[in-house]
Amino acid sequence: MDSELNSLLEKTRSFSLDMLKLTYQESIPSELALPTAFWESYGDEKLAIGLRACLAIWATSGKKIVPNEFQLTATISLMSGQDTLVDVGTGYGKTLCMIIPCLLDSPGSISIVISPLKRLQAVQVLEFERYGITTVAINEDTPNDPELWKVWPLVDFFWQLSTLFCLENMYREVFGTSGST
């Protein structure tokens, strides 16, 4: 992510609710802004998460995209520590539900996405990178070459990594569990 965007995201992490409201009103065109009724059910903490999410996507998409209601509902739920299930069809924007928390989290945080298909991993990696998030897919096609891991010392590699995609069966091998709770 370029330093200007990173600086902007860092600033919004520290904005007060009043500053978030003002910035949202001044930045997001009224025709793209979510209806007032959507925001009314949220208390201050969750409202701040939602506004911050809108501003993060607006900035990283080149001022083109504002998350829709289901994406914000999912983000607010995730960022509030709740278990979250998003059940919408192909092409509706589930990937953005994974991208937004990465943008809102502190720099250096790591997200792990378990993805069942290598092609889906490839598409999602490209989408994450489009928003400036350093991403890598690790699956059975990743070389099992010790030299690869010497190039990226494990600790540094994971600190630089924002999102890691891996196949469900690799998750089971590494963690010895099905991944479900």
Q: Where are these predicted regions, by residue range?
A:
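N-terminal helicase ATP-binding lobe
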Residues: 1-181
